[in-house]
């Protein structure tokens, strides 16, 4: 504090740059400094005058920046003090609460909801699902959060985001509450495959998830990511390795998944025209090793009786 007084004595303006000193003190949780600056009359509601980079808000302008950043970093004492002094907890569409949910600050979320923030906030719900904050999600649901939004066609639904991040506990919780995974039009199994959580894939399929939705996305993603055992599993569950005009092997070619390409060639039923198309596809990416293997495979087809 002596250093701040020193600079003030030398003519420093603690309110300059739109209350930047206060914003930084709040962001880093320095409550004593925050109180001192507020007592000096620094504006606690100051809006950023230009587009700022907060990645979760896509660079949009926000007000009550000090409160929002304190909430993001979990500084409950700073948040509660700023609210007491007149900061708006609901500013920028409950943005402080959303960030507190994203970063797992349960007590901050609870405080902000109790002070007027809307628990039924899609982005807070989705961020909880992505970041595996089950207790915060349960709290938001207890306060009226809707986990059944009209987004069955949308990869941005709560259940889809939980699957995409491999959050098994969150998925089980949502299913336990009645979220229907059998008629979700986005491919939840594909989401789980992308997260490499194969146990979650098995769970979803066992509970009725359709592996063929979204134009056979599950087997296509498994192929392009090189997950041979997962491709085998999906085939046992009724998937067709030749779906979408052999798109699975084409994606494997595009990603240079040589072992996957060899596996699909070994189990599939290809004619010379099919392989000629695959050769053209590989040539487009200038994958000489794959092109040569496909040419050999095509020659073997020609020599078959």
UniProtKB/Swiss-Prot annotation:
A Pfam family reported for this protein in Swiss-Prot or TrEMBL:
Ank_4
Which domain of life does this protein belong to?
Viruses
**Is Ubl conjugation one of the keywords?**
no
InterPro entries documented for this protein: Ankyrin_rpt (IPR002110), Ankyrin_rpt-contain_sf (IPR036770)
Q: Which UniProt keywords apply?
A: ANK repeat, Repeat
Does this entry carry the keyword Oxidoreductase?
no
Q: What is the name listed in the Swiss-Prot or TrEMBL entry for this protein?
A: Putative ankyrin repeat protein R777
* ANK repeat ranges, renumbered to this chain: 1-16, 17-46, 62-91, 93-121, 123-149, 154-183, 184-213, 215-243, 245-274
Q: List, alphabetically, the PROSITE patterns matched.
A: ANK_REP_REGION, ANK_REPEAT
């Amino acid at each position: 504090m002596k250093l701040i007084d020193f600079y003030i004595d030398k003519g420093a303006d603690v309110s300059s740059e739109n209350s930047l000193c206060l914003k930084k003190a709040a962001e880093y949780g320095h409550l004593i400094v925050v109180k001192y600056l507020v007592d000096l009359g620094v504006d606690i509601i100051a809006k950023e005058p230009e587009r700022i980079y907060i990645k979760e808000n896509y660079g949009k302008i926000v007000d009550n920046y000090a409160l929002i950043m304190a909430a993001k970093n979990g500084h409950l004492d700073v948040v509660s003090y700023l609210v007491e002094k007149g900061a708006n907890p609901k500013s920028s569409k409950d943005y402080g609460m959303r960030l507190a949910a994203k970063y797992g600050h349960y007590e901050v979320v609870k405080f902000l909801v109790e002070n007027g923030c809307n628990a039924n906030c899609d982005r807070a719900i989705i961020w909880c699902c992505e970041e595996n904050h089950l207790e915060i999600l349960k709290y938001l649901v207890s306060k009226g959060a809707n986990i059944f939004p009209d987004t069955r066609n949308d990869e941005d639904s709560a259940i889809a985001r939980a699957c995409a991040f491999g959050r098994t506990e969150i998925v089980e919780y949502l299913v336990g509450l009645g979220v229907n995974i059998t008629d979700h039009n986005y491919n939840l199994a594909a989401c789980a495959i992308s997260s490499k959580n194969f146990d979650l894939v098995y769970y979803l399929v066992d509970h009725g998830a359709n592996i063929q939705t979204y134009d056979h996305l599950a087997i296509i993603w498994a192929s392009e990511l090189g997950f041979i055992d997962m491709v085998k599993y999906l085939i046992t569950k009724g998937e067709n390795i030749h779906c979408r005009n052999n798109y699975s092997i084409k994606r494997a070619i595009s990603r240079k998944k040589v072992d996957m390409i060899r596996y699909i060639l070994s189990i599939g039923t290809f004619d010379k025209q099919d392989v000629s198309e695959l050769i053209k596809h590989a040539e487009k990416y200038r994958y000489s090793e794959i092109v040569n293997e496909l040419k050999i495979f095509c020659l073997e087809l020609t020599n078959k009786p």
